[in-house]
């Protein structure tokens, strides 16, 4: 079984090219593949297929709204094996892989996801690196029903803004938090939040106030833990930072441990632009894969 390994600002993925959607991706198999000691190691797995093939194979119950059968489809799994609606860094790496492998020749095309269609623009790409923009759709802030959204991260309580970017986020901007304090925060430790507000869990971002157009962010992703970057999380962070500044739209650089991305928020949608790197290509032992499914 062939694979590729890539990352977007060090949010890393194993890509499995499975255009007929025939692979059996169990939670156990995905978790083993993502394990950094007994597998290849990754924050998640990207199955490369089309929406029509995924629906025909039963991977999808139905085509997501706005996604056509002949659109590419990113079947994304978190490192614990759970299915995720969307991954902004993953879409960039997915699009880069399509171009680098010759499966796609266009500069602009659609990548489908459970969260819907994500139009991409490949500004530049070669076998190793790419610069990709993704139309992430409109990021919607969520009401709290009169109860504040809060999370505890690294033993510290933060107020946050709930943002839907195709998946749920709690973006916690602390105007008093310094870059050094953010770097010292234990984001890898389990986070706590009101499960009644987020019954399906939530991705939690902690960020500084913007300075010279730059926001510093760290993230604890549901189903994964701390990652070096989270594409949808950077969009949520940009929305929170703009909202705190009294703005509805704007462009910010979001600096995560894995690098920088640029997020633009408009009245109608949001855009995420950043790098992708393809690191390796290889083959997974069929015997190991079968054992990992158990």
Swiss-Prot record:
Active site at which residues? 87, 230
Q: What is its main location?
A: cytoplasm
- Gene Ontology cellular component terms for the protein in this record: cytosol
- Extract the PROSITE patterns matched here: DAP_EPIMERASE (PS01326)
GO molecular function terms noted in the UniProt entry: diaminopimelate epimerase activity
- The answer to whether UniProt assigns keyword Amino-acid biosynthesis to this entry is yes
Q: In which residues is substrate bound?
A: 11, 78, 88-89, 167, 203, 221-222, 231-232
What GO biological process term is on the record, naming one? Answer: lysine biosynthetic process via diaminopimelate
Per UniProt, what is one Pfam family of this protein?
DAP_epimerase
InterPro entries linked? DAP_epimerase_AS (IPR018510), DAP_epimerase_DapF (IPR001653)
- What reactions does this protein catalyze? (2S,6S)-2,6-diaminopimelate = meso-2,6-diaminopimelate
Keywords of the record: Amino-acid biosynthesis, Cytoplasm, Isomerase, Lysine biosynthesis
Q: List where in the cell it is found.
A: Cytoplasm
Q: Where is this site: Could be important to modulate the pK values of the two catalytic cysteine residues?
A: 169, 221
Give the Enzyme Commission number: 5.1.1.7
Q: Which residues form the signal peptide?
A: none
Its assembly, as annotated, is: Homodimer.
Q: Say which family it is in.
A: Belongs to the diaminopimelate epimerase family.
Name recorded for this polypeptide: Diaminopimelate epimerase
Give the organism the record lists: Mycobacterium avium (strain 104)
């Amino acid at each position: 079984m062939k694979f590729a390994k890539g990352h977007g600002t060090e949010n890393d993925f194993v890509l499995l090219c499975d255009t007929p959607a025939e692979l059996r991706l169990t939670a156990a198999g995905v978790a083993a593949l993502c394990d950094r000691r007994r597998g290849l190691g990754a924050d998640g797995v990207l199955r490369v297929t089309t929406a029509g093939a995924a629906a025909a194979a039963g991977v999808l119950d139905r085509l997501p709204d706005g996604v056509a059968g002949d659109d590419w489809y990113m079947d994304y799994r978190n490192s614990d094996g759970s299915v995720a609606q969307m991954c902004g860094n993953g879409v960039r790496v997915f699009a880069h892989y399509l171009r680098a492998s010759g499966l796609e020749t266009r500069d602009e095309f659609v990548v489908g996801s459970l969260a819907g269609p994500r139009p991409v623009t490949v500004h530049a790409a070669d076998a190793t690196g790419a610069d990709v923009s993704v139309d992430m759709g409109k990021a919607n802030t969520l009401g709290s029903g009169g109860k504040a959204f809060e999370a505890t991260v690294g033993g510290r309580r933060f107020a946050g803004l709930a943002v839907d970017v195709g998946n749920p986020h709690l973006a916690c901007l602390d105007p008093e938090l310094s870059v050094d304090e953010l770097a010292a925060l234990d984001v890898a430790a389990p986070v706590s939040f009101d499960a009644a507000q987020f019954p399906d869990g939530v991705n939690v971002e902690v960020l500084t106030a913007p300075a010279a157009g730059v926001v510093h962010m760290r993230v604890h992703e549901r189903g994964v833990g701390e990652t070096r970057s989270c594409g949808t999380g950077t969009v949520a962070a940009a929305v929170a930072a703009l909202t705190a500044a009294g703005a509805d739209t704007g462009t910010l650089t979001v600096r995560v441990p894995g690098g920088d991305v640029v997020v633009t928020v408009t009245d109608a949608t949001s855009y995420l632009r950043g790098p992708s790197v393809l690191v390796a290509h290889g083959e997974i032992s069929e015997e190991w894969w079968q054992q990992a499914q158990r």
